[in-house]
């Protein structure tokens, strides 16, 4: 049963090129599409966790002008989150994962306010990976664990896979299914620790182009799979 679904919303820039529109317009469309996806998924009551790979640490190495446009769009969207009916009506709890210190204080404050406001909601959880990299998350978790070891708070002999997971950026259900758009077939550092047994689906469309029918199709395909978890 599908409970946790994750998205790598790839292809915004290529969508802009193919449609002859600006990067700004394409990214705005991509942001709107994320809300569309949340609305489409709401008809599946068993799906209570949705994860978006919004911006990787590697993405921050893109040209400065493009980053300024992208972060401005994100800031504008963050300012609207607490006013959106979908958040309240669906009881969405929002968490951000990633290296927050790479963003401005104002951007960090926006994320903190959203997390604090939506902490009252528990029906569904939306995880937004921003300034994120899976390998970096593991390194940060190990650093956190070793710091506690140095203080005598933990016993390395008792360390398990589940125990180390407690030191990751946030506690949420590992994705049952990861969906990537734009024809690319790789995870690009997304949820490296949590995706060990995730099923994968790749859509031959750019992120702004996906439809409700595409979401229905990947959900139906998942339900027909038999997960063995390495057994």
What label would you give each PLM region?
Residues 1-231:
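Flexible, compositionally biased loop and terminal segments
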